[in-house]
Structures are given as structure tokens and as C-alpha cells.
Amino acid sequence: MKFITRFLCVPVAGLLALTSCAKDEDESYVQFENQALEAWMTQHRSDLVQNYQSDGGYYIDLIEAGDQSLDPIGKEPIWVSFDFTGRDLAGNIILTRNADSARLAGTFSKYTHYVPFYRYCGTENTGLMEGTWLAMRNTLKLGEKYYNANKDRLGLRSPELQLRYGTKIQLYMPSSVVGNGVEGTGGYEGQYTLSSKRPFIVTMEIRDTVNNPLEREGGDVDGFCDD
């Protein structure tokens, strides 16, 4: 009986050891990538290093603050309409919902209707890239130096902000809040794909909040066809 017990314990112990090793490797890679992204930001976008968001480990560049008289989109669960263009660290466009960006990438097609994404943004993430969901739901923080240099241009009164209608922002994200590789589909692709475990730069602009996205998009498509 003791022999059988020892016999059964050996593979279980081995499985636990392998699981522990895999977890340690994943955690080590995340730490390595975060350090590598920080080094890249320090070299290429040192002005954004203080704009680090601890929940998600990404950096932000606020291009336009949006209409500050309106409620932030994270106030309650809602469907959000937003333009989206994603690039790798070399600046190559991976996917885009923007016609001008598609022309820049050389992938524009007159048969593609370039409309914003419609995604549900709730208290739990069900359909958004993790980093974009975190940016939509959380209060973001700007570094003191960045805030002082840009507050007048952006019309800000606080280094803390939330996304709302008209906000245009760039996110520099580690793969941990991106997913396992990225590529465009359905005419929205760029000239490249993003391999897994690679950082991703997303430029997004909040275009609207939508109660019925199917009805809205159907109307947009009908208008496009009429034109």
C-alpha cells in the first residue's frame, strides 16, 4: 500500500513541479517584457514614462481630452463607438478602422466601409482588448511634468482623467493586456500582423456612446450604400 501511495505521488509531484515552472516562466517573461517596454519608452518616448498606468502596465499619450462637460464613458456600462488603429513598435499598421490610416498603410479599399468599432464596455471585460477596456473603465493618471506641459493645450484642470466623447489617446501596451497576437480581418488589416508576446501601440478616439449599436451601424451602412 505504501508503495502504491508513493507511486501515485511521484507523477502528481512532477505535474505540480511542471505547473510551477510554467507559472514562473510566464511571470518571468511578463517582468522581462515590462522592463523591455520601459527601456523602449525611455529611449523613444521619455516624455511618457511618468504616464505609466500600474493597472495593466501600459503608458498613455493624451492627444485630445474630449468634451469635459460630458460624463466619462466608464460611469456606467454602455456600448462605445471608437476609432481604432494599432501599430507595432516600429510604427507598422497592424489593423485600422480609419480610412486615412488605411491609405497610409497602402491597404485602403473602396469596398471596405471604415466605421468605428462598437464594443460593450461593462464592469467585466467581455469583448475588448484588455488594455483598451482598462483605459475606458479606469481613472488615468498623467505624470506631473507631462501634465504641466500639456494642461493648457488639452484644457485639463487635473492630472487625473477619464475617457469621454472626443477623447483621443495613444496606449503603449505590453502583450499581457493585448492578447495572443493581433491581425486585422474583413478589410481592416494593415500590411503586417503582430506576433504573440509583442507590445502594441493603439490610437483610439471615442466617437460616441451607443444604446443600440446594430441599429446605428445599419443606418451607417445604408447611408454608405446610398452615397
Predicted regions and their residues:
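Cross-family detector of peptidyl-prolyl cis-trans isomerase
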Residues: 21-227
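Sec-dependent bacterial lipoprotein signal peptides
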Residues: 1-21
